[in-house]
Design a protein with these regions (language model features):
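Alpha/beta-hydrolase superfamily serine-hydrolase fold, recognizing
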Residues: 1-278
Length: 278
């Protein structure tokens, strides 16, 4: 018998359809939960894509809620991060049913998903992140529930969209250029969504502890951009746990491997440290 049960539930109802989350529920829960956000250059993949890491975290006792969300080219910034905030609110509202502590919820995401979890965590209750109605949101207490999280795990995050856009142009990555254009309506919108800009302009209302992971052979996320993210976070006195992983490519953890197993252990250790610090 599997140690993890998987079920899909609707977490939000929008004008364009329902949004699903896949729940990875451990048979032996440790009472804590995390919301997972997939990558895909803001234009591809779904809640099933990061199943390897979802199963690893759930096997260790965590409830994992892996989200579908609206993305490009049919939807533009900030739709995705608004949906992610709704996903956090849903888990918080249903914490008793899901058997998780609402005060220890975290966010984890990779690549563009790493960008989106940072964006959501820094501005959880901004007006633009209150626009996706969660299921049962007719109740005022539900609709006003906070999307704040206790910590963030950002795996190879595209933290500064305009910087990565120029990098993609300079390196001839036309598919990445097209993906940026598909989700962001302009360079101004990319700049608006820059995590570094938000940190340095004091727009961030919440700066939770963060684990940032940079693979050494990442051809999609330049290391200089990630180091600038670390610096910007530290400038706000944010707690940063930075991991550089030599020899590994972008998005390696979407596939089972020893490196993925090691990363899962490191992620769990970081999460446990944040929960223990309460």
């Amino acid at each position: 018998m599997s140690e993890v049960e998987q079920t899909d539930v609707v977490y939000a109802c929008t004008d364009t359809g329902d949004l699903l989350m896949r729940l990875f529920r451990p048979l032996k829960s440790n009472g804590h939960g995390i919301v997972m956000v997939h990558g895909g250059a803001w234009t591809a993949n779904d809640r099933t894509t990061p199943w390897v890491m979802c199963e690893a975290l759930a096997t260790a006792g965590m409830l994992v809620a892996s989200l579908d969300f609206r993305c490009g080219p049919n939807f533009q910034h900030p739709t995705a991060s608004a949906d992610i905030a709704a996903g956090v609110r849903y888990v918080r509202v249903h914490a008793d049913e899901l058997q998780v502590d609402p005060n220890t919820l975290g966010l984890i995401g990779s690549s563009s998903g790493g960008h989106l979890v940072l964006l959501t965590a820094l501005k959880p209750d901004a007006l633009e992140h209150m626009t996706t109605p969660i299921l049962d949101s007719d109740d005022e207490g539900v609709s006003l529930c906070s999307a704040k999280v206790h910590y963030v795990v950002a795996l190879w995050p595209v933290s500064d969209p305009p910087v990565r856009y120029r990098y993609a142009q300079d390196t001839g990555r036309s598919e990445l250029v097209a993906a940026h254009d598909g989700y962001f309506s302009s360079l101004d919108q990319m700049q608006n969504a820059s995590v570094q800009r938000i940190l340095r302009s004091d727009e961030a209302t919440h700066v939770p502890p963060v684990m940032i992971v940079q693979p050494g052979e990442d051809a999609n996320v330049p290391e200089a951009m990630t180091l600038d993210l670390v610096a910007a976070y530290q400038e706000r006195d944010g707690l940063v746990h930075y991991r550089y992983l030599p020899g590994l490519p972008h998005a390696f953890a979407y596939q089972p491997s020893k490196a993925t197993d090691t990363l899962a252990i490191d992620v769990l250790a970081f999460i446990q440290q944040q929960i223990a610090g309460l």
